[in-house]
Amino acid sequence: MVSNEKSRLKKSGVSWEEAVARAGEYFRYAGSFDPDYVEWLGAYSDSSGIPLNELFVLLCDSEKGFCTDIMLNGKATADGSVFSVHTEDWRPADSKHLVLLKGRPRGEPSYLAMSSAGMELICGMNSSGLSFTGNSLDQNDMRVGVPKLFLARRLLASRTISEAMFVATEEDRASSYNVNICHKSGEMYCVEGSATDYALIYGA
């Protein structure tokens, strides 16, 4: 993953040293927002032998692609089922790193998530009956702040829709996905956001 990122950045005219320095500006926001995730990344760094500041570059990456999300509740399904659907339109070079991750964190709901190398949590569902997916948005107000992949982990730790919506609209976020939050009851919301603004769409 790191080697792929180095090659991609080099082609875009950004040196690896510059990328590491830029990502470092986000670190204190990330640590304040989710210290448990930072601790997890530290353990990942220790076990993989990849320096933490280099791993962190991957979590501050710009838009990776343009995914598609669909949410359906009982009003639109023949048997009353609720569906939360996501296509992961990823860079081909990184597709081999996509894995399903089953997590049972202490004090938080257990979850099943799509991840990149078990580190970046992309979308998933948890034992509280919540799911979230997200797709990339073009936005013109990106800034130094909490990386949106940190929001993804906290979304999976949410126990209620209101808690998940609070996470999705974190005021110090660096940027945002189009975040789709769904509950097993059929309640669903789309939070279409950027770094400094968002629109809330209720899926009736």
Regions found by a protein language model. Give the residues of each.
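N-terminal nucleophile
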Residues: 1-204
